[in-house]
UniProtKB/Swiss-Prot annotation:
Keyword Repeat: no
Segments forming domain GATase cobBQ-type: 252-442
Alphabetized InterPro entries for the sequence: Class_I_gatase-like, CobQ/CobB/MinD/ParA_Nub-bd_dom, CobQ_GATase1, CobQ_N, CobQ_synth, GATase_3, P-loop_NTPase
Active site: C333, H434
Protein name, UniProt field: Cobyric acid synthase
Organism expressing this protein natively: Desulforudis audaxviator (strain MP104C)
Length: 496
């Protein structure tokens, strides 16, 4: 039997669609249904390497985790990775298709939509339920003629739609009513009801507005969801970095992550950010490095452009000074490339920061793979042989001309090989390994090593492991949906 589809759309970006879909996946997977997530087109710089070496949006990987199934390219057949003014890299079914400007991409969509629809068909053939996520808003007038991420999906699948509004940013009633007004009649007919998300305060104060929404649209407000604090779950958009981070308390380890304009896969740092005794913040000014015990130079979608940005901001000198003071500096993926001696792309060779004996060249082929292995000996006092796993997504290939490896890694069916580079003197290191801090033992030992180097007393972690924290939070969202919307109500919308 073909799976039933329920779609979650929003009145804006960051309304909470991704986590609501994740919660629905967990809620119904716990009840024994075969569940799959779906998002036809996703725009994000935080991506994920699937077990078969393909690339999808990070949110769909999280939703697959919530559903208890392996992530697959059919869950996110089209991924757009912004590259700045040039447009976006289009990743089709997990493989890079090319970089397209908006006008060219709109013409391409006529060919892409059948492929996205076929991916949804394959998911429906193997599942009982598919929970689909929209993108942005379904009522953007300038985008509607080319929108294959919202109502086009719902109409194709005959899916009921939950429309989510973010009350935290204000204007939720106007946004819900305005969205309904701008939809075509056949699209409005698919909307089963509304969800007000991220509410803080006394829900009784909302009653008049909720009643008005119901009276004006003929659809109920299905539930009001509170703002959830302390979630250990991924976000996709760098807008999520606004206001992130905290000031260190006495005895905390202060970690500064450089907020590159084209930062990618900053989900790498969520395990550190949510660790007790660690104060992680995102910085973009040289003076903000002064109080840091360690600095991380993260991944970038455009390494050379972000390297030029570092130099314009004076952060190149600040990072060299930081390293010269014997403080730990770690580069991941694009950050690793920037720490090296040179970066070559086409006929252009650009000097790196010169802190690691590494030369990088960019190539057309892209490496996308899940890997596992162990730590190498002698890096910052971190013990060798610690289990670690993660993934690589990069187009550059680096030649290491000295130093020592950070890890010994292997992909599926391969032996362990040296990976990354740590300077022989000082505490500068770099790696292509995304997700290394998800590994509890490595993260704990990395924190302990940096605390020692900073002269801070040891502080054992008393938290559950990061994976356990994620599972707890997915259950927390599922429980909230069951409480605030109701399982019977959701079953009715699904036709169960």
């Amino acid at each position: 039997m073909t799976a039933r589809v329920l779609m979650v759309q929003g009145t804006s970006s960051s309304a909470g669609k991704s986590l609501i879909v994740a919660g629905l996946c967990r809620l119904y997977a716990r009840r024994g249904f075969r569940v799959a997530p779906f998002k036809s087109q996703n725009m994000a710089l935080n991506s994920y390497a699937t077990p078969d070496g393909r690339e999808i949006g990070r949110a769909q990987a999280l939703q697959a985790e919530a559903a208890g199934v392996p992530p697959h390219v059919d869950m996110n057949p089209i991924l757009l990775k912004p590259t700045g003014e040039a447009g976006s890299q289009v990743v089709l079914l997990g493989r890079p298709l090319g970089v397209y400007k908006p006008a060219n991409y709109y013409a391409l969509k006529e060919k892409l939509w059948p492929l996205a629809a076929a991916a949804l068909d394959r998911l429906r053939a193997d599942a009982d339920l598919v929970f689909a996520e929209g993108a942005g808003s379904p009522a953007e007038i300038n985008l509607r003629p080319h929108d294959i991420a919202n109502m086009e999906v719902a109409l194709y699948a005959g899916a009921s739609v939950l429309l989510v509004g973010d009350i935290e940013r204000g204007g939720v009633f106007a946004s819900l009513l305005g969205t309904m007004e701008l939809l075509a009649e056949r699209e409005r007919e698919l909307v089963a009801g509304f969800v007000v998300n991220k509410f803080r305060g006394d829900e009784e104060l909302l009653r008049p507005g909720l009643a008005l929404i119901g009276a004006r649209t003929g659809r109920p407000v299905l539930g009001v969801l509170p703002y959830l604090h302390d979630l250990h779950l991924d976000e996709e958009d760098s807008v999520g970095l606004s206001g992130r981070g905290k000031a260190p308390a006495p005895g905390d380890l202060a970690v500064a992550v450089i907020r590159l304009p084209r930062i990618s896969n900053y989900t790498d740092f969520l395990p550190l950010e949510t660790e007790n005794g660690v104060a992680l913040c995102y910085v973009d000014r040289p003076q903000e490095l002064d109080g840091a015990h360690a600095v991380i130079l993260p991944g970038s979608k455009e390494t050379l452009a972000d390297l030029a940005w570092l130099r314009r901001r004076g952060l190149d000198r600040a990072l060299r000074d930081f390293a010269a003071r014997g403080k730990p500096l770690l580069g991941i993926c694009g950050g690793f490339q920037m720490l090296g001696r040179t970066i070559r792309e086409g006929g252009q060779t650009v000097a790196g920061l010169g802190l690691l004996p590494v030369r990088t060249r960019f190539a057309s082929e892209k490496r996308t793979v899940q890997v596992r292995g162990v730590t190498a000996e002698g890096v910052w006092g971190i013990p060798g042989g610690l289990s670690v796993r993660g993934y690589e997504i990069h187009r550059g290939f680096s030649e290491v001309c000295g130093g020592r490896p950070c890890f010994l890694l292997g992909g599926q069916g391969t032996g362990l090989a040296p990976e990354g580079c740590a300077a022989e003197e000082g505490y500068v290191a770099g790696t292509y390994l995304h997700g290394c801090f998800d590994s509890d033992t490595y993260r704990t030992q990395w924190i302990a090593a940096v605390r020692r180097l900073a002269g801070l007393p040891a502080r054992p972690s008393e938290q559950p492991g990061f994976a356990a924290r994620r599972q707890r939070d997915l259950d927390r969202i599922a429980d909230l949906l069951a409480e605030r919307i109701g399982v019977e109500r959701l079953d009715g919308i699904l036709g169960l």
